[in-house]
């Protein structure tokens, strides 16, 4: 299991959510087996997304898709308000 962790500012959460939802089929086809959307309690204009994949290689490929096809297009990422920070994480321990 690997998690693609993404965080970035947004201009409007509703607009961001609608854009995120439009790519549900792409996430499924790319191997995403679960996701979490979080927001800081003190910042309605920031979003954190965790996308779970069976392998780190799948997470890396999907990150490449986001970097080249989504985040570079105002039509595909209409609420993106700053450069996304990303990491691919693997679990070490679980409680």
Predicted feature locations:
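Short acidic/glycine-enriched loop/turn segments that link adjacent beta-strands
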Residues: 42-45
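Residues that cap or initiate secondary-structure elements
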Residues: 12-14, 55-57, 92
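An amphipathic, aromatic/His-enriched active-site/gating alpha helix that lines ligand/cofactor pockets
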Residues: 17-36, 52-86
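Short, surface-exposed ligand-recognition loops at beta-strand->loop->(often short) alpha-helix junctions
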Residues: 9-19
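Short structural boundary motif marking the start of a folded domain
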Residues: 1-4
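Residues that line or immediately flank small-molecule/substrate-binding pockets and catalytic motifs
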Residues: 39
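Short hydrophobic/aromatic beta-strand micro-patches
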Residues: 7-9, 50-52
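Short, low-order "capping/linker" segments at domain edges
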Residues: 87-95
